[in-house]
Swiss-Prot record:
UniProt main location, coarse: virion
Tagged with keyword Nucleotide-binding: no
Similarity annotation: Belongs to the high plain virus capsid family.
Disulfide bonds: none
A single GO cellular-component term on record: viral capsid
Protein's recorded name: Capsid protein
Length: 289
């Protein structure tokens, strides 16, 4: 008894069917005699931010320079350029679109930026979360360095974080990857970006995209609710308060009102002989609103 098997590409025919079984030689197979291969262990993730930050020979100036020039470095990434940085006594090699691997010093762009953020925050004496003790502790970094006045985080400035603001250097691409050492800060900053997404003009397809990087880091530590409890929701709330405190509003409405006040002050200082009808009408409309 012959038998036909239909699939998306056509029909396969077997000559005989005996007791419900087809003889393998009756159907042409593309892959046969399967041979087992051991799993590729290159997928093991060797990256550890905390371990790298315990390395000797910090070149912290490179971290400040990298965040300052992050726009140029990001363009290099977009152009698929591999980059190398001397952050320690060994090089950090940055490969665009890199997947997790066994190497400790070959990283993706976002992880490299997280490393720079971590170095700077260590230098700024931020406390580090100890997962074993479930609390924040002093970091033991003793590096003595005064950053150049020219160093700045342009992305943070555009979001209202001045150079004096505690989170000026933290608000950068890849901050989510500092979760192992700054979990409350990462969660609070993700909450800030989500809640201020319109003001910050963040582009996204779905709201979940705004917190997805943070969620991936949280779930590495366990159940979301449990991790939140370990870190401490009260602590997360305090970190959020720190983020929004003394931040300059960048809302267009606020800035529009501010500039109108300045315009009115200037208007009052202009000699009446220089005031044409156009500018008078403009200010009459403003005062009449």
């Amino acid at each position: 008894m012959a038998l036909s098997f239909k699939n998306s590409s056509g029909v396969l025919k077997a000559k005989t069917l005996k007791d419900g079984f087809v003889t393998s030689s009756d159907i042409e197979t593309t892959v046969h005699d399967f041979s087992y291969e051991k799993p590729d262990l290159s997928s093991v993730d060797g990256f550890s931010l905390k371990s790298l930050l315990s390395s000797d020979g910090w070149h912290i100036v490179v971290a400040y320079q990298s965040v300052t020039n992050s726009e140029r470095l990001n363009n290099n990434k977009k152009n698929n350029k591999t980059q190398r940085f001397k952050l320690f006594t060994f090089d950090i090699i940055v490969i665009p679109g890199l997947k997790p691997n066994k190497s400790k010093n070959v990283v993706s762009y976002n992880r490299f930026m997280a490393l720079c953020i971590g170095m700077i925050c260590y230098h700024k004496k931020w406390k580090v979360f100890n997962w074993s003790n479930k609390r924040y502790e002093d970091n033991k970094n003793t590096i003595n360095f005064n950053e150049d006045d020219d160093f700045m985080n342009k992305l943070a400035m555009s979001a209202g974080f001045s150079k004096e603001h505690k989170y000026h250097w933290f608000y950068s691409t890849g901050f989510e990857y500092t979760f192992d050492i700054f979990p409350a800060e990462v969660i609070a900053m993700s909450l800030f970006r989500w809640s201020h997404r319109v003001e910050l003009k963040i582009k996204y397809e779905h709201e979940s995209d705004l917190v997805a990087p943070m969620v991936r880091q949280v779930t590495k530590r366990g159940n979301i609710s449990d991790v939140m409890d370990i870190v401490g929701k009260d602590i997360i709330a305090k970190k959020y308060e720190e983020i929004v405190k003394d931040r300059s509003s960048i809302g267009i409405g606020t800035k529009y009102n501010d500039i109108l006040d300045e315009f009115k002050d200037i208007f009052n200082k202009i000699d009446s002989s220089s005031l044409d009808s156009t500018i008078k009408n403009c200010f009459n409309k403003i005062d009449g609103e």
